[in-house]
A protein has these predicted regions:
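Hydrophobic helical h-region of N-terminal Sec-dependent signal peptides
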Residues: 8-14
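C-terminal segment of classical bacterial N-terminal signal peptides
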Residues: 14-22
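Short glycine/proline- and aromatic-enriched beta-strand/turn motifs that initiate or cap beta-hairpins
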Residues: 21-80
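A generic structural signal for ordered secondary structure
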Residues: 41-47, 95, 172-176
Length: 207
């Protein structure tokens, strides 16, 4: 099972590296995407590290909670571009709604993802409004306590700010790993349009 997990992580990282013009597509503009399932009954709390292609590191705290058929996520943190550039403040909100359940004819589950967020920095602030569809399916390997949700998330994002507005398309690729009843590990990356590409790695405590 460990070999299977490591192989999947390597494939995801390699796919992101193979496409040099990927987009940041989520609410705060980092390549952190979402599986079609929520991993929690009430809420989850965790952290995400993102590594854009151009350098620098983003760190975000994330909190997501159930609200009827929706779950709503709040995220905020900082992006440090390095090379003496100003640190960017990140803040955003996301919502997920399950809209597709797998059948004999269509083997994937799906959820609609929408959000809004901001990158705040002097002379380069941006408002990001993404909308996408996450498609995937949970895999429960026999004899293992670890389950995996590989998924894709095609996403459009409207970006407006201290520069000409733009509509970009990103193709998210990721996997969620249920390591225990209370712990999830996550990796994702974006393919598609610029401005940024990279990978995100996170962990959450689920309740």
């Amino acid at each position: 099972m460990r070999r299977e997990v490591m192989a999947l992580v390597a494939v995801l990282a390699g796919a992101v590296e193979a496409f040099p013009r990927a987009a940041r597509a989520q609410a705060t503009g980092v390549p952190s995407f979402n599986a079609p399932y929520r991993a929690f009954q009430r809420s989850e709390l965790g952290a995400v590290f993102s590594f854009p292609e151009g350098g620098g590191t983003a760190f975000e705290g994330v909190y997501r909670y159930a609200h009827g058929k929706f779950d709503i996520g709040l995220r905020g943190g900082f992006f440090s571009p390095g090379n003496g550039a100003n640190t960017v403040v990140l803040a955003g909100v996301e919502a997920r709604q399950r809209v597709i359940t797998h059948t004999m004819d269509f083997p994937l589950d799906g959820a609609l993802m929408v959000g809004a967020g901001a990158n705040l920095v002097s002379g380069g602030s941006a408002l990001i409004i993404p909308a996408g569809l996450s498609l995937g399916r949970r895999i429960d390997p026999q004899g293992s306590t670890v389950s995996i949700v590989p998924y894709v998330q095609p996403t459009f994002a409207f970006i407006v700010g201290d520069f000409p507005s733009d509509l970009v398309f990103g193709f998210g690729v990721g996997a969620d790993f249920r390591l225990s009843r209370v712990l999830d590990a996550r990796i994702s990356g974006g393919l598609g349009d610029r401005p940024l590409t990279g990978v995100s790695i996170g962990g959450v405590w689920v309740h």
